[in-house]
């Protein structure tokens, strides 16, 4: 008796179901062993190979996107009497599964540097894809859709292109400290800070009182300030001329004022004269010239020759007229009397 071949009904939704669930597609495409018979070794159904390629090429949709597992062709596998070395070692780590998954999807990966344990053994860092729009997650498998990456490891090693020795790179973001350590650090900083300088108000030093000297007694001067001649000198001069003559106070004041005015006018005329010569020093010959030409006064013998006018001009004292005064006449009379007594 022949067995009737059973074929699934064709419908437009079969293609959608096959793409949505690869296991159903594999079951539908696989013939029963009674129809197909025992396949030879190394033989693989072309429908299974095509479905396997479609399953591998399809990217994971939505969600957390864990590593995709490869679907092996449904073949009769003989059970091994003892486990294989791969089974002994256990299932491959999720890192290798993830690496295989991204290699099949054609996504480039960035090779992470190696990290060394304290025992000196190198431990390969997890390889994660570096693609626009994807972020690294803290778990073993990277998340694709907008997941925020966890903190990077503290000590990383940069692998050089020439295969040089790895270099330690310090972590850019410091690890948060526990609150106890933070309090200890703040306490140490407060102790290290110098205390604010305290201004010590020193008592004012008593200054020794200086003994105030009594104000000097103002003695009225006989000569006013700036006067050239004093009254006492006038008395001495009068005693030389006539011992019997006595000057009154009013006469003395007038004589002092007259002497000051005479000296001031004499100096004023001398300054005007040297100004014409463009010099800044008054000489004795300037005063002699003014006394002779302006006041008609005889000059002293030491200034008999001068350079004013012609150089050959010489003053002759014999030509000067001497007019004796009354005091001179009295002195001469006294001398004559004394001579007669002798």
Swiss-Prot record:
Main localization category: nucleus
GO BP terms, alphabetized: RNA polymerase II preinitiation complex assembly
Domain of life: Eukaryota
InterPro entries: Histone-fold (IPR009072), TAF12 (IPR037794), TFIID_TAF12_dom (IPR003228)
GO CC entries: nucleus; SAGA complex; transcription factor TFIID complex
GO MF: DNA binding; protein heterodimerization activity; TBP-class protein binding
The keyword ATP-binding is annotated on this UniProt entry: no
Location of region: Disordered: 1-221
Alphabetical keyword list: Nucleus, Transcription, Transcription regulation
The protein's assembly and partners: Interacts (via histone-fold domain) with taf-4 (via the histone-fold domain). Interaction may facilitate the nuclear localization of taf-4.
Its job: Part of the general transcription factor complex TFIID. Plays a role in recruiting taf-4 to the nucleus and thereby activating transcription initiation by RNA polymerase II, as part of the TFIID complex.
Domain remark from Swiss-Prot or TrEMBL: The histone-fold domain mediates hetero-dimer protein-protein interactions.
Protein name as catalogued: Transcription initiation factor TFIID subunit 12
Gene that encodes it: taf-12
């Amino acid at each position: 008796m022949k067995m009737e071949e059973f074929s699934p009904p064709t419908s437009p939704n079969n293609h959608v179901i096959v793409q949505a669930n690869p296991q159903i597609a594999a079951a539908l495409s696989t013939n029963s062993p009674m129809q197909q018979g025992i396949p030879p070794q190394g033989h693989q159904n072309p429908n299974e190979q095509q479905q396997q390629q479609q399953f591998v090429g399809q990217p994971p949709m939505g969600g957390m996107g864990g590593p995709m597992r490869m679907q092996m062709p449904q073949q009769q596998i003989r059970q091994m009497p003892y486990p294989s070395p791969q089974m002994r070692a256990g299932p491959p780590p999720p890192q290798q599964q993830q690496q295989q998954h991204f290699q099949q999807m054609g996504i480039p990966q960035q090779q992470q540097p190696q990290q060394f344990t304290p025992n000196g053994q190198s431990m390969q860092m997890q390889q994660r894809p570096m693609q626009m729009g994807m972020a690294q997650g803290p778990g073993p498998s990277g998340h694709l859709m907008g997941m925020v990456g966890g903190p990077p490891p503290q000590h990383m090693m940069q692998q050089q292109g020439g295969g040089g020795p790895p270099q330690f790179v310090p972590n850019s973001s410091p690890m948060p400290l526990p609150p106890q350590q933070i309090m200890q650090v703040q306490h140490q900083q407060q102790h290290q800070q110098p205390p604010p300088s305290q201004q010590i108000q020193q008592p004012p030093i008593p200054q020794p009182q200086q003994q105030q000297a009594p104000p000097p007694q103002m003695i009225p001067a006989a000569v006013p300030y700036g006067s050239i001649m004093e009254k006492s000198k006038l008395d001495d001069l009068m005693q030389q001329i006539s011992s019997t003559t006595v000057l009154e106070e009013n006469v003395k004041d007038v004589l002092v004022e007259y002497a000051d005015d005479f000296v001031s006018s004499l100096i004023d005329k001398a300054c005007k004269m040297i100004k014409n010569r463009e010099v800044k020093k008054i000489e004795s010959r300037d005063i002699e010239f003014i006394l002779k030409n302006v006041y008609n006064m005889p000059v002293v013998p030491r200034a008999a020759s001068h350079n004013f006018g012609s150089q050959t001009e010489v003053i002759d004292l014999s030509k000067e007229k001497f007019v004796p005064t009354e005091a001179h006449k009295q002195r001469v009379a006294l001398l004559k009397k004394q001579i007669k007594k002798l």
